[in-house]
């Protein structure tokens, strides 16, 4: 697998998987990446070296400028907003799943069912290449 890393300053990268919001990272001077089904189920994996580690899901990165480089303000605000755009995706403790892409699950079906409402977002993001 390969993963495209880029350098961004004072921007948040939001990874979308299967049409739903997945994870948000703030990049300050180094390349960082995480691919998560959605926030509560897969923790962030920060990487300083391109190509390190694995990508578990095919995602597209959406780049949004942020006002502050402080993770406590920027990340929490964007992550909270992003997750709540898709109702029904709240995590339940112990519901972690390691299913590979393409394997149907109730959680993924629910995520796909809400895709149209997410894709009509009023903030047009900049699409970056897919990670495979």
Swiss-Prot record:
Organism: Homo sapiens
UniProt-recorded name of the protein: Putative uncharacterized protein ENSP00000381830
Residue numbers spanned by region Disordered: 91-132
Signal peptide coordinates: 1-35
Keywords attached to this entry: Secreted, Signal
Low complexity bias: start-end ranges: 115-125
GO-annotated cellular components: extracellular region
Top-level taxon: Eukaryota
Location of the protein in the cell: Secreted
Major location category of this protein: secreted
């Amino acid at each position: 697998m390969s993963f495209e890393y880029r350098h961004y300053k004072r921007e948040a990268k939001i990874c979308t998987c299967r049409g739903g919001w997945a994870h948000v990272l703030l990049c300050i001077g180094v390349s960082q990446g995480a691919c998560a089904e959605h926030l509560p189920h897969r923790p962030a994996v920060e990487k300083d070296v391109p190509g390190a580690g694995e990508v578990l899901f095919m995602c597209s990165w959406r780049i949004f400028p942020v006002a502050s480089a402080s993770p406590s303000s920027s990340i929490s605000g964007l992550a909270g907003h992003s997750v709540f755009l898709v109702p029904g995706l709240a995590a339940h403790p112990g519901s972690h799943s390691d299913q590979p892409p393409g394997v149907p699950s109730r959680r993924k079906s629910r995520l796909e069912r809400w895709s149209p409402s997410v894709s009509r977002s009023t903030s047009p993001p900049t699409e970056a290449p897919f990670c495979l």
